[in-house]
Swiss-Prot record:
Lineage, top ranks: Bacteria, Pseudomonadati, Pseudomonadota, Betaproteobacteria, Nitrosomonadales
Pfam families the UniProt entry points to: UbiA
Name this polypeptide is given: Protoheme IX farnesyltransferase
Keywords: Cell inner membrane, Cell membrane, Heme biosynthesis, Membrane, Transferase, Transmembrane, Transmembrane helix
Pathway of action: Porphyrin-containing compound metabolism; heme O biosynthesis; heme O from protoheme: step 1/1
The organism of origin for this protein: Nitrosomonas europaea (strain ATCC 19718 / CIP 103999 / KCTC 2705 / NBRC 14298)
EC number: 2.5.1.141
Described function: Converts heme B (protoheme IX) to heme O by substitution of the vinyl group on carbon 2 of heme B porphyrin ring with a hydroxyethyl farnesyl side group.
Amino acid sequence: MTTSSLAWQQATARVQQFYRLTKPRVVSLIVFTAVIGMFLSVPGAVPLDKLIFGTVGISLVAGAAAALNCLVEYKFDAIMARTKGRPLPQGKVSVPETLFFLVLIGGFGLFMLHQWVNPLTMWLTLGTFVGYAIIYTVILKPLTPQNIVIGGASGAMPPVLGWAAVTGEISADALLLFLIIFAWTPPHFWALALYRKTDYAKIGMPMLPVTHGDEFTRLHVLLYTIILCVVTVLPYLTQMSGLIYLGSVLILDAIFFYYAIRIYLHYTDQIAREAFRYSIAYLALLFTALLVDHYFYF
């Protein structure tokens, strides 16, 4: 192996570690809902400049928020089985490097949104960053078992950001998209917390199963799933969406409710794991249904 090829491999490996700091699998779902918000905001095509700069800008700031989350929690991550392989606990990147990286990509993302999208989107995205990386990660997460419920507001913002990127305003329909993700967040994360309870207990994180027990958490998964099922019908009831969406969401909700019932009545870690994975697919499919219905409304 030549010196140049070795240097290239090392550089590529370093880039991959910084990329991992952005939690690409999580961010991809966030950005997907933001892009769908862009398309839902207009009856026709999204202006190409808004689509490109809005998507890239939101992606960069979301990646910076994820990197700050990794930075704040890296000592906890080193203890938890699910997260001990992340770059910071493994020593693949340093704390100063992570801080520099997140400031760089976050700052450039905000600059891009301000200059080439609109100031409203930039300020909303900055507020979302602060809500997730500071208010949720630093303050709420180690303080209260309701961290997911309260902090879920920041996680529900991406479709609103996408909407604002194209229209320069926030409409009632955009807030409906926010409400869907806000209602989705508790059953999604509590399913994870149930089968990862031991990990959270190790680090003293007050997740709901740790502070209130499994039965209480399972009940709340069911209750919030019912709320979600009601909320997700609202786009049809408000005539934002039509029958394609309604048919799709009723099927998706029925499956989600099935998992919630199983978690409540016949809990196993495997069921909770399956429910968590389904909840990710659920959100992606629901927003896909919104998009398809938007252009083929009847």
